[in-house]
A protein has these predicted regions:
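Active-site-proximal beta-strand elements of phosphoester/diester hydrolases
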Residues: 3-6, 21-24, 107-113, 129-135, ...
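Metallo-beta-lactamase
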Residues: 70-130, 242-247
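A general structural motif
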Residues: 18, 42-44, 70-72, 127, ...
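Short acidic loop-to-beta-strand element that houses the catalytic metal-binding Asp/Glu
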Residues: 11-15, 119-122
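Binuclear metal-ion centers of metallo-dependent hydrolases, dominated by the metallo-beta-lactamase
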Residues: 5-10, 74, 86-102, 176-179, ...
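Active-site neighborhood of phospho(di)ester-bond hydrolases with catalytic His/Asp-centered motifs
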Residues: 22-26, 43-59, 75-80, 131-135, ...
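Pre-active-site segment of Zn-dependent metallo-hydrolases
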Residues: 13-52, 59-67, 136-181
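Active-site environment of divalent metal-dependent phosphoester hydrolases
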Residues: 28-30, 53-57, 81-85, 100-102, ...
Length: 247
């Protein structure tokens, strides 16, 4: 049994027969976390944070352990959170960077790369392989449509100079590294963020072109609306991939 519940933005709670996984918690408008954990108090809870950005990590997650004497929590965090001094070393059970692995008797975790901050996650649990992208995405896709995409430009929005072609190569390079580990996921959670502009589905499309995916779950669309995430559905249908509609 796998039960996936959307929390908010890039946050999800995944419950299996043996445990509960919580990814990139930011806020919980519907009270998902406490409701699900209270229903399954005997199951161990694994809490993941892929990087330090405030929409993927909040110190509130540490209060769950303090407030619950019945549940067993394991905190698995990206090392950039420690480097940015957003958390103390002793507050997490496991600190991970790209290429590191960790496992116990229930799950195996591999930290894969990101072309933004921190890591993405491969989690093997109860015979299933799960992928959470964190902030791994083709964020500069709209600039690839310009007359000179292979040229450094300045974005006031991002406040930096960048080369769209170089940035896309970084993203595709991370996908290549992930394929060295596995080319198949039962469940994939990936950014489909309309704020990127034209081509905002490109990163997710490039991913499903390279991997076997049992189900695609969009995320990181809070500011652009549920409808923007649905734009991925036709691309998934073309490939026979189930699409998880949120909203």
């Amino acid at each position: 049994m796998i039960r996936l519940t959307y929390i908010f933005h890039s946050g999800f709670l995944l419950e299996t027969d043996s445990c509960i996984l919580i990814f990139d918690y930011w806020m919980d408008p519907s009270g998902v976390v406490h409701r699900c954990i209270n229903r399954s108090k005997i199951k161990p809870v694994y809490v993941f944070a892929s990087h330090f950005h405030e929409d993927h990590f909040t110190r509130e997650i540490f209060t769950w352990k303090e407030d619950s004497l019945e549940s067993n929590y394991t905190y698995i965090l990206s090392k950039d959170i420690l480097k940015r001094r957003r958390a103390k070393k002793e507050e997490a059970d496991v600190w991970m960077a790209k290429g590191s692995t960790w496992e116990d008797e229930l799950i195996k975790v591999t930290a894969t790369g990101s072309n933004d901050s921190g890591v993405s996650w491969i989690v093997e649990v109860d015979g299933k392989c799960i992928f959470h992208a964190g902030d791994l995405c083709n964020w500069y896709a709209r600039f690839l449509e310009g007359p000179n995409p292979d040229q450094e430009i300045y974005s006031e929005e991002f406040g930096e100079h960048f080369n769209p072609v170089t940035e896309e190569k970084r993203f595709l390079g991370e996908l290549k590294d992930i394929r060295k580990i596995t080319d198949s996921f039962d469940l994939m959670m990936f950014p489909v963020d309309g704020r990127i502009g034209n081509g905002y589905t490109l990163g997710a499309r490039q991913f499903i072109d390279r991997f076997k995916v049992g189900m695609l779950v969009p995320m990181h669309f809070t500011m652009s609306g549920f409808e923007s995430a649905w734009r991925m559905q036709p691309f998934c249908q073309e490939k026979g991939i189930p699409f998880w509609c949120i909203g």
